[in-house]
């Protein structure tokens, strides 16, 4: 067997394998014999078709099958011997039987060779959130909204109120357009942007007022729309007082006292924003390393991440895109993002290799112990059995390895903590 490896690019190679008849003929003869036993040709008993006729009829398909099997057999051995690191399935580009030899040409993508930059000089800022009483109050207010009551208000509409009115579309002269009236339309001012023309027109108005609203086109050359709103009612969300009885109801008897409930809210907020702080830091780290290592990405790897992003988007809309949605266009639009994912995978694999990182069963046990502290209803043994199962083990190993990779990076870069206020949210 002879082999010739040609570098096509940083991420692509071609392999030429030349086999002697002694190396491929046994497989060819076996395929021919199996075909002779099964092929039916009119005028001949099954299994008694002359070999010459059989070669003329199905010879090309046998040659293709033999080339496929020989390529698979020898590529695996050559890849191990030459330390080839394929990034895609090998494809047969051509094969040729001539002068007692079988020549097979194979193409495939490889992981690129590159050097990691010294990232010890990199600096990152990590948000450090401190939960204040005001943050707890704001979170509790959001919870109480689910237990509030909408009541009619005589006051002028303010942020957070709901305005109910009849809406009529107007023509360019300000006259009602027949059939355009929409009765009892609800405007929840809280969820309208501050610059929304309806919110701007309705805030400060009371029941009985009539307001005209002009909605200008977002794009040049678009149509300007005009509406008249006859306000019939302003409703305000009245929140209940937080007391021990309501705490029992809200927490489903987990807590009996307001103080205990508030403390739990504080702990939840602290855990949430600690996770957010860590997530944002890791995102900043990966973005920096991707930027500093413009590594070429194998197309098969990029396509893999494009498919993942496509399936994730599909799950977010219930498992099926709406009718008329162009999946191919979306797939192509995901390519830049997929390239970043592929590049980060190559970089993180390089870090793991250079630092001899691996995941042991002891690592998985330690991970189970840590997770059990977060979920008291599950024991370490229960989690460990799940993590070591066929369905979950690869995922858990990948998760732990990622943690180790980031730990290596964090140990070498400079991370500065920065006091950061908790962002308001609705």
Curated annotation (Swiss-Prot):
Which ranges carry the PPIase FKBP-type domain?
Answer: 160-240
Report the function annotation for this chain: Involved in protein export. Acts as a chaperone by maintaining the newly synthesized protein in an open conformation. Functions as a peptidyl-prolyl cis-trans isomerase.
Q: What Gene Ontology terms describe where this protein resides (cellular component)?
A: cytoplasm
Named from the GO MF annotations, one term is: peptidyl-prolyl cis-trans isomerase activity
User: By its UniProt entry, which SUPFAM superfamilies does this protein fall under?
Assistant: FKBP-like, Triger factor/SurA peptide-binding domain-like, Trigger factor ribosome-binding domain
**Reactions that this protein is recorded to catalyse:** [protein]-peptidylproline (omega=180) = [protein]-peptidylproline (omega=0)
Q: Which Gene3D superfamilies match?
A: 3.10.50.40, Trigger factor ribosome-binding domain, Trigger factor, C-terminal domain
Domain remarks in the Swiss-Prot or TrEMBL record: Consists of 3 domains; the N-terminus binds the ribosome, the middle domain has PPIase activity, while the C-terminus has intrinsic chaperone activity on its own.
HAMAP family, alphabetically?
Trigger_factor_Tig (MF_00303)
Provide the gene name from the record. tig
Record's family? Belongs to the FKBP-type PPIase family. Tig subfamily.
Q: According to the UniProt entry, what is the EC number of this protein?
A: 5.2.1.8
Which species is the source of this protein?
Chlorobaculum tepidum (strain ATCC 49652 / DSM 12025 / NBRC 103806 / TLS) (Chlorobium tepidum)
List keywords of the entry alphabetically. Cell cycle, Cell division, Chaperone, Cytoplasm, Isomerase, Rotamase
Q: What is its main location?
A: cytoplasm
Q: Name one GO biological process term.
A: 'de novo' cotranslational protein folding
InterPro entries the record matches: PPIase_dom_sf, Trig_fac, Trigger_fac_C, Trigger_fac_C_sf, Trigger_fac_ribosome-bd_bac, Trigger_fac_ribosome-bd_sf, Trigger_fact/SurA_dom_sf
This chain's protein is named Trigger factor
**Localization, UniProt:** Cytoplasm
